[in-house]
């Protein structure tokens, strides 16, 4: 085999390995990108609320879905609320384990319209951690959030009057290494 053929094989192997590494890293990198930019309706997390209150009132609709593998009931206590940008709100979802076994779930979330994701900030949420319910247990799950007042000055979002906060609960599957 010539040196040129060997170099071509090495180059192809390097390209394939690079592509595999990129595929492996793409999900966490995309997740980080979405959290930083608010892209795709990804909500930001915050530890402190805004001190400035906005002028407009925005209606927040709450949605709850469950993957068919999770034997729970899951729903918001209220279907919607209103909030002024900068005002912190606390709302609750309810969950119930419908089985006689311990079951763990993990919630994923987003907001629509997607363009407001970067302005929707969660202070506290059940979605940050795995939730485990004992047999037939009912529980209340809090969500504390606020809308960044800058939503009013952004030409892309200044006309938004309705935001939907949506959760989907999935059965938590333990992974072994």
Swiss-Prot record:
GO terms of biological process kind: respiratory chain complex IV assembly
Cellular component terms (Gene Ontology): plasma membrane
Membrane-crossing segments per the record: 9-29
Cytoplasmic side: 1-8
Membrane topology (Periplasmic): 30-177
A Pfam family hit: CtaG_Cox11
Subcellular location: Cell inner membrane
Function: Exerts its effect at some terminal stage of cytochrome c oxidase synthesis, probably by being involved in the insertion of the copper B into subunit I.
Family in the record: Belongs to the COX11/CtaG family.
Protein name stated in the entry: Cytochrome c oxidase assembly protein CtaG
Species for this entry: Ehrlichia ruminantium (strain Gardel)
Lineage, top ranks: Bacteria, Pseudomonadati, Pseudomonadota, Alphaproteobacteria, Rickettsiales
Gene that this polypeptide is encoded by: ctaG
């Amino acid at each position: 085999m010539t040196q040129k053929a060997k170099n071509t094989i090495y180059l192809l192997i390097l390209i394939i390995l690079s592509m595999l590494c990129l595929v492996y890293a793409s999900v966490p990198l995309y997740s980080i990108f979405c959290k930083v930019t608010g892209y795709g309706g990804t909500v930001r997390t915050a530890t402190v609320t805004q001190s400035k209150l906005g002028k407009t009132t925005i209606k927040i609709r709450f949605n709850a879905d469950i993957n068919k593998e999770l034997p729970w009931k899951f729903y918001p206590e209220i279907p919607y609320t209103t909030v002024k940008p900068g005002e912190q709100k606390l709302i609750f979802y309810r969950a119930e384990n419908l089985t006689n076994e311990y079951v763990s779930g993990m919630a994923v979330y987003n907001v629509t319209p997607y363009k407001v994701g970067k302005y929707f900030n969660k202070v506290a949420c059940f979605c940050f951690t795995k939730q485990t319910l004992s047999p037939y247990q009912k529980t209340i799950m809090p969500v504390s959030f606020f809308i960044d007042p800058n939503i009013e000055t952004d030409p892309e979002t200044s006309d938004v009057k309705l935001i939907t906060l949506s959760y989907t609960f999935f059965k938590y599957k333990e992974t072994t290494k």
